[in-house]
Amino acid sequence: MKYLHLIFASLFRKKTRTVLTMLSIFSAFLLFGLLSAVSALFSSSGTGEVATTRLVTQARTSFTVSLPMSMLPELEAIPGVKAVSWRQWFGAVYDDSPNNVFGFAVPPARWAAMFPEWVMPEEQKKAFQDTRTGIVVGKLAAERWGWKIGDKLPLSSNIFPQKNGSKDWQFDIVGIFDGADENYRRQTSNQVYINFDYFDEANQFGSGRAGIFNVQVESPSLMESVAAAIDARFLNSANET
């Protein structure tokens, strides 16, 4: 401890160097968080047979750029599209530990229909639809932190504060989902899903936008043509994909 003053003196001897170093460290952690989000996003989009008819549609410029919900009916009208869902990365933090929870805001009914690999009793699916502040949590995550249905779950968002400026959110646990097989079960260790309507109304940055759209096509043979049709539909618009 007797050298502490020397450390601080050295740090602030060249303030520009210190600031740039701190910014570099911050950027590294930010990049890690964003890339972890991308990994969770595509992992939760499915693997194997269940994912052979699902596309992820995102903004062409960057996965961090959101898309307007006005695109929804246009996506649904594209030939070969069977169903469309969406999600927004929430940036959840539990118990002051960053990157330990991957939280997404989703439309409950569409999410449950498009992602059957997440197994949950029907009454819990309905509770998720009916509870504005509802959240469903992965089985392994619930076991890890001792979460139970009926609990209040406090989460912070490092991206989306509420309209009152607070980064602290509180949700009601209404369901616990498991994976359809061992691969999906492993992914329940850190995933949670919140009701999109509540998030959309309460977040400070406005409503009516999704991070990505999940598009289910009618047949695996249509994947390439539907993807091309989506890109063509929004080409030269403000929302290129």
Q: Over which residues does each language-model region extend?
A:
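N-terminal Sec/SRP start-transfer signal
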Residues: 1-31
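Extracytoplasmic
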Residues: 52-54, 70, 96-101, 130-132, ...
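Diglycine-centered glycine-rich loop/turn motifs
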Residues: 111-137, 142-143, 148-155, 183
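Soluble periplasmic/extracytoplasmic beta-strand elements of cell-envelope proteins
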Residues: 54-58, 85, 100-105, 134-136, ...
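Amphipathic alpha-helical segments that mediate coupling or scaffolding at interfaces
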Residues: 10-11, 45, 216, 233
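Hydrophobic, regular-secondary-structure patches
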Residues: 26-104, 108, 120-131, 143, ...
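Alpha-helical membrane and juxtamembrane elements of multi-pass inner-membrane transport
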Residues: 1-5, 9, 40, 55, ...
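Mechanotransmission and gating elements of multispan inner-membrane complexes involved in transport
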Residues: 78, 98, 141, 159-241
